[in-house]
Curated annotation (Swiss-Prot):
Main enzyme class: transferase
The reaction(s) this protein catalyses: (R)-pantothenate + ATP = (R)-4'-phosphopantothenate + ADP + H(+)
Residues binding substrate: Y96, G103, A104, D105, R106, T183
Role description: Catalyzes the phosphorylation of pantothenate (Pan), the first step in CoA biosynthesis.
One Pfam family hit: Pan_kinase
The protein's name in its UniProt record: Type III pantothenate kinase
CDD domains: ASKHA_NBD_PanK-III
Cofactor detail note: A monovalent cation. Ammonium or potassium.
Primary gene name: coaX
Species in which this protein is naturally found: Polaromonas sp. (strain JS666 / ATCC BAA-500)
UniProtKB keywords: ATP-binding, Coenzyme A biosynthesis, Cytoplasm, Kinase, Nucleotide-binding, Potassium, Transferase
Protein origin, superkingdom: Bacteria
């Protein structure tokens, strides 16, 4: 019973095929394409893949992209299922005012992070950081309740906003410096420090609320860019959403 996990973000579609819809299942194949190229999946990357028995994905890219992805999966006789945030799943309690409005990628990443810690015998508060087109910073207490989270622009959105609203800021991407002395470095450093500062603030908030410092897990396509500038101890995990999808699938598709 092979299992296909899908993570459809704002920029790319990432996929991973596993031997089974179970935690710890062997990874058989994986890949990623930009959204403008998803219409080639059935003819290219997925054409030689063994047909999956189960498909589960999370998507934040909107209904038009979802339809295009679904069309590509018509080469298999399998109906994909999509994660919608719920009041509770896989041991995580959703503290959002309207649970279904929480982004599916945020929900799945938190489930992945929570179980990653539990598998190591760690039952502590946790901060989950996703660095992509947008940046999210989530807080989970030791009991597994999602307390709340923040959303801020990613590096690219910050720079484009400044370029469109300020004359003379169409400059090349710079480097992160403690004390930038040119506009390129000033812009890149400012965006990086804004994200790092948001994470630091959420760490302080949850430490005060829970009475102990949290674990911090970071993921996302641009997570590596943040790594050198983080002021808190963290773990960088590329596969966090796939980890969460496996946790959910192991329950939904249990024999």
């Amino acid at each position: 019973m092979t299992f296909l996990a899908l993570d459809v973000g704002n920029t790319r579609l990432k996929w991973a095929q596993y031997e089974a819809p179970a935690v710890g299942a062997r990874l058989l194949a994986h890949g990623a394409v930009f959204l403008e190229n998803i219409d080639r999946l059935a003819e290219e990357e997925w054409s030689e893949m063994s047909p999956p028995t189960r498909i589960l994905g999370c998507i934040v890219a909107g209904d038009a992209i979802k339809r295009r992805v679904t069309e590509q999966m018509e080469l298999w006789d399998v109906v994909p299922r999509w994660v919608v945030s719920s009041p509770q799943e896989a041991g995580l309690t959703n503290g959002y005012e309207h649970p279904a409005r929480l982004g599916a990628d945020r929900w799945v990443a938190m489930i992945g992070a929570r179980h990653r810690l539990l598998a190591r015998g760690i039952s502590k508060p946790c901060i989950v950081v996703m660095v992509g087109t947008a940046v999210t910073v989530e807080a989970i207490d030791a009991s597994g309740k999602f307390l709340g989270g923040i959303i801020l622009p990613g590096h690219g959105i910050m720079l484009r906003a400044l370029e469109s609203g300020t004359a003379g800021l169409h400059v090349p991407t710079g480097e992160v410096r403690d004390f930038p002395t040119n506009t390129s470095d000033a812009l890149t450093s400012g965006g990086t420090f804004a994200i790092a500062g948001a994470v630091q603030r959420m760490v302080e908030n949850i430490t005060r609320h829970c009475g102990e410092p949290p674990e911090c897990i970071m993921t996302g396509g641009a997570g590596w860019k943040m790594a050198p500038s983080m002021s808190v101890k963290y773990e960088l995990v590329d596969s966090l959403i796939f980890d969460g999808l496996l946790e959910i699938a192991s329950r939904r598709f249990a024999p």
